A protein has these predicted regions:
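Contiguous, structured surface segment used for ligand recognition
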Residues: 1-88
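Feature activates predominantly on carbohydrate-active enzymes
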Residues: 51-197
């Protein structure tokens, strides 16, 4: 697939790798297609396919991936036009990563790709004690936790797909699982609340 941009080249570098990833997920997609992409300020997604050319006009990177996903699933048609008005500036999903165990990094990446294909641009990771805290081994004990490097990796991956990663980190309360362990008395106020200094 040849991608031609009629707008700023910075978007090209951002979506080139993500486009390859999404196309690789669609087995059998090896069509010789020219893809023309233009970013605009209006909250619309426009797709126009004529034979071996697809024109996509959109506002955000995640909208581009929604349009690309639509085009991939309508490739058997010689020609089509599709238009959609984007109703929300921010639209996405919150994953609760504090119930039993955290999602693997690969599963979160899969969900990021899915959100992009749906045109969504926000992923919130709700974490109570499932993140790394230096010197506090009981955070995420026996449940898993995200390291700083994993959160950075997920943030970079999400950015490539136009998705904002928002780590919703509990820093004062809802920490029952971490504070139940011996040795946490110095920082515990009550069963699930930290003692601020």
């Amino acid at each position: 697939m040849n991608i031609v941009f009629s707008s700023d080249k910075k978007e090209y570098n951002t979506i080139k790798k993500g486009t390859k990833i999404l196309l690789a997920e669609n087995d059998g997609f090896n069509q010789n297609i020219e893809l023309f992409v233009k970013f605009q300020d209006r909250p619309e997604i426009l797709i126009n396919k004529r034979k071996k050319q697809i024109h996509i006009i959109c506002r955000e990177i995640s909208h581009y991936y929604r349009a690309l996903n639509y085009a991939i699933h309508h490739m058997e048609e010689d020609e089509f036009q599709y238009q959609e008005h984007v109703c929300f500036e921010r639209n996405g999903l919150m994953l609760d990563c504090s119930r039993n165990a955290v999602f693997t990094v690969e599963k979160v990446k899969f969900l990021i790709r899915t959100l992009a294909k749906l045109g969504m641009n926000v992923l919130m990771l709700y974490t109570e004690d499932t993140y790394e805290v230096e010197g506090q081994p009981y955070f995420g004990a026996y449940r898993g936790k995200y390291t700083k490097d994993e959160i950075k990796e997920l943030d970079a991956y999400a950015s490539m797909f136009g998705v904002e990663l928002v780590p919703c980190i509990q820093t004062l309360a809802h920490l029952h699982n971490a504070l139940k362990w011996p040795g946490m008395d110095k920082i515990r106020d009550s069963a699930d609340i930290l003692q601020p200094e």
